[in-house]
Amino acid sequence: MGLPNSQHIGKILVDPRNSDVVLVAAEGPLWSAGGERGGYRTDDGGKTWTATLTIDENTGATDLEFAPGDPNTVYAAAYQRRRHVAGFLSGGPGSGIHKSMDGGKTWRKVTTGLPGGDKGKIGLAVTPADPTIVYATIEASNAERGFYRSRDRGESWEKRNSYISGGTGPHYYQEIEASPTDADVVYQADVFINVTRDGGASFNVLETGHTKHSDNHAIWIDAKNTRHLLVGTDAGLYESFDDGREFRHFPNLPVSQFYK
């Protein structure tokens, strides 16, 4: 399908109007500079790719979101990171949020209300319950890091909470998913899943890891029944039908994370 030098893919979006048009957030190589990193677009089903969002040799893209009902409007999260033998550099001036108004062909950086210094990993979420709202969880300095909300399609932002995912570090998580029916409800992947029901003003732990594995990395919400959740963890896939009170595990899928 192409982009062999990207090594890590953060997100793939398929244009609902034309499945030959695909946008990719390419994180790029972890252990070296360069490679294929940033935002890419194909108009021929993956036969050829065009780099449309290029920042620098150490900054790739980790997240993409179409504006609900308007795939011409796209939001992208850029992430500067590099691993060395002696440590991991998570963040820098390259990280930030970008917006496209032409389906990912061109981009501009949005900054109003966002942290002004170096930023780390950023997760994005949108909701058809209110297409003007965009959420972002942003790794930054202790004073500026936190959960941000835009009410004007990403043009300006306000900090709602200082909470970001933790555990081994925000770079390990920073995935958020907004309810498709309630614009104030957002789930955040973390060691344990956290949820806000007031647009980020407060967060509470949804589950404690007693009925499922911790280390959550992906969350899906059923638009027809928002109490129905699918969660991807280091131990594989889990499903809940009661908004995270109880989970069942699917042990027959080869999707667990092994460590040595």
Predicted regions and their residues:
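Beta-propeller blade termini and top-face loops
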Residues: M1-K260
